[in-house]
Regions:
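Conserved short histidine dyad/triad with adjacent acidic residue
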Residues: 26, 40-55
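A short, N-terminal "cap"/entry segment at the start of jelly-roll beta-barrel domains
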Residues: 1-37, 134-170
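A hydrophobic, small-residue-rich beta->alpha segment in the mid-to-C-terminal subdomain
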Residues: 117-133
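Glycine- and acidic-residue-biased ligand/ion/polar-headgroup-sensing regions
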Residues: 57-69, 74
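Ligand-binding loop in jelly-roll beta-barrel domains
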Residues: 70, 90-116
Length: 170
């Protein structure tokens, strides 16, 4: 349901644009909150990690709806069960993982808003990578170019260390 100015005032459980490769659903776009925040929901299958990265513009807060989310926030590992919040301040690196056996589902808020556009653009890159249209090197370089525009820095060199700390991977 939208008001006359087209800003959302009610978003149902199955509403919001869904990005299938990333398994992210846009729930509250930044324009609905005067650019103050963006809210999305995302899922993470068992054994999957969101790589270490740092945001230079946004604070993030995750609320765990389902499963257990393992997080490395600035070097501190926390395991967040259902009902937990995980705060990831701007400028602090973080990585997120589903180290369990059940899917994880999270509500994520970015403040200020606008980061939903990164998800939209990265969905296209991830789709090309998943289909084999681009290789891993091009995937990383394209992701880096996109992320630079949005103030995100991925720390791929930390992936083996973080995977070991999360207890996942080879």
């Amino acid at each position: 349901m939208a008001r006359k100015d087209n800003k959302e005032i009610f978003i149902g459980p199955d509403e919001g644009a869904h990005l299938p490769i990333l398994d992210i659903a846009h729930k509250v776009p930044s324009e609905s909150l005067g650019s103050a925040a963006t809210i999305v929901e995302w899922g993470l299958p068992p054994g999957v990690m969101i790589p270490p990265h740092t945001h230079s513009r946004e604070h993030e807060c995750s609320y765990v709806l389902k499963g257990e989310l393992t997080c490395d926030v600035g070097g501190e590992i926390v395991v967040a069960p259902v009902g937990s919040y995980v705060v990831k301040p701007r400028g602090v690196y973080h990585a997120l993982c589903n180290a369990g056996t059940e899917p994880v589902w999270v509500i994520e808020m970015h403040a200020p808003g606008g980061f939903e556009s990164w998800y939209d653009e990265y969905e296209q890159i991830a789709s090309k990578f998943a289909s084999g249209e681009i290789d891993e090197e091009e995937h990383r370089s394209t992701r880096a170019e996109l992320s630079e525009r949005y103030g995100v820095n991925f720390h791929d060199e930390r992936i083996p260390e973080v995977m070991a700390r999360f207890g996942i991977g080879p």
